[in-house]
Amino acid sequence: MDANVLIMAGGTGGHVFPALACAREFQARGYKVHWLGTPRGIENELVPQAGLTLHLINVTGLRGKGRLSLLKAPLMLLKALMQARKVVRQVKPVCVVGFGGYVTGPGGLAAKLAGVPLIIHEQNAVAGTANRSLASFASRVCEAFPNTFADSSKRRTTGNPVRVELFLETPRQALAGRKARLLVLGGSLGAEPLNKLLPEALSQLPQDIQPEVFHQSGKNHDAVTAERYRNVGVEAQVAPFIQNMAQAYGWADLVVCRAGALTISELAAAGLPSLLIPLPHAIDDHQSRNADYLAREGAAFVMPQATTGAAEMAARLKEVLMQPEQLNSMARTARSLAKPDATRTVVNVCVEVAHG
């Protein structure tokens, strides 16, 4: 098929990874995929690696910036819009698909001005600033979590595109004649509160329910985190990164982690129960809303960072580790919330809009 699609996503993996999954699906259907990003985001590494054409515009976020930056903002946004319009004219896409990040504001407006159908995908339970603005004139809005957007005539609940290898056929049976396996995820940059909390909490558990521990600490945090475990007499494998997440999820019986949108979707895909500690200063407290999606159905417990010390974490760990059937039930519930067709569904929506 001789047709171009322009994907907009930038900044963090939370925006870029779902967009990459959809880019591969577009390519499988014969579309040529172009990508609109910014010079400083993770897309600069990942998009060329995927063999996609990357176009860059100069735009940054405005939250938390000083007065001088805010005074310069209108000029920056105007320049970014002009750059985005040039890309849209050059690519001539049948549709423009935004997955979030600063790039989507100017890019989405450029699509609107050019009369090109715009579709946006929101990964979080609370829409980001750019997507909230674009939703008013987008042709369609895809949401990972139900009722993120108010306009039911435009929205489609698709789930988050995640790696297909994470979808286990059936959830594992936890504690099947062995020690429980606890996976701690701090994210690529690490979550120092989790790195401090878990060693102390695990040291308070009775020896007979001590789990095997695999702790992803984040870059430059592995040595000190491993030392914390040694100091309290808890055996743990500590790594700065986990290269094979599918293998790690397949190993685990229980996960302690933040509540980023992709993490929530991956936990559901893998059918894993979790103890979620939302990032307390996330924009619009979106991680708490993400966590509620699993917690209200019984697939997770939410443990606010401000009220969760070592004693509280130890008590919750003891509760779930001593009840294998509860872990199994949480795992089944998590798996029931997965959206295995999310990638295809998002691309189907785009194709319908582009050619409908």
From Swiss-Prot:
Keywords: Cell cycle, Cell division, Cell inner membrane, Cell membrane, Cell shape, Cell wall biogenesis/degradation, Glycosyltransferase, Membrane, Peptidoglycan synthesis, Transferase. The keyword Protein biosynthesis does not apply. Cell wall formation. Catalyzes the transfer of a GlcNAc subunit on undecaprenyl-pyrophosphoryl-MurNAc-pentapeptide (lipid intermediate I) to form undecaprenyl-pyrophosphoryl-MurNAc-(pentapeptide)GlcNAc (lipid intermediate II). Pathway: Cell wall biogenesis; peptidoglycan biosynthesis. GO terms for cellular component: plasma membrane. The gene is murG. Belongs to the glycosyltransferase 28 family. MurG subfamily. It is an enzyme of class 2 (transferase). Pfam families: Glyco_tran_28_C, Glyco_transf_28. It is a peripheral membrane protein. One of its GO terms (molecular function) is undecaprenyldiphospho-muramoylpentapeptide beta-N-acetylglucosaminyltransferase activity. It catalyses: di-trans,octa-cis-undecaprenyl diphospho-N-acetyl-alpha-D-muramoyl-L-alanyl-D-glutamyl-meso-2,6-diaminopimeloyl-D-alanyl-D-alanine + UDP-N-acetyl-alpha-D-glucosamine = di-trans,octa-cis-undecaprenyl diphospho-[N-acetyl-alpha-D-glucosaminyl-(1->4)]-N-acetyl-alpha-D-muramoyl-L-alanyl-D-glutamyl-meso-2,6-diaminopimeloyl-D-alanyl-D-alanine + UDP + H(+). UDP-N-acetyl-alpha-D-glucosamine binds at residues 12-14, 124, 163, 188, 242, 287. InterPro entries: GlcNAc_MurG (IPR006009), Glyco_trans_28_C (IPR007235), GlycoTrans_28_N (IPR004276). GO terms for biological process: carbohydrate metabolic process; cell division; cell wall organization; lipid glycosylation; peptidoglycan biosynthetic process; regulation of cell shape. It is found in: Cell inner membrane. Its EC number is 2.4.1.227. It comes from the Bacteria. This is UDP-N-acetylglucosamine--N-acetylmuramyl-(pentapeptide) pyrophosphoryl-undecaprenol N-acetylglucosamine transferase.
